[in-house]
């Protein structure tokens, strides 16, 4: 690869999660935003600056990030960008949200967890 693709999969071991990044599948507890993912998406929507494209449109920006052991978000990347600056705006908004997530849990310990999130953007020009 070119080194830009997000790495999926588990690089820790079952007995010592270490700093490997886990996927949501098979985790004891998935990472969670306070109030749930709907709450997180509402916050994203409130802070998202929509482009002026002169027509109504619904687009999806697919983002990838890592929920760290302390609940912060890192490695924020756009996996699929519909254009119009929406990918860059998605990254800006995610970085601006300071509320911490509850981290993923494996073997009763917080672990770094990969998270994929589609953000639907509705432009009502």
Regions found by a protein language model. Give the residues of each.
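Charge-biased low-complexity segments
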Residues: 1-125
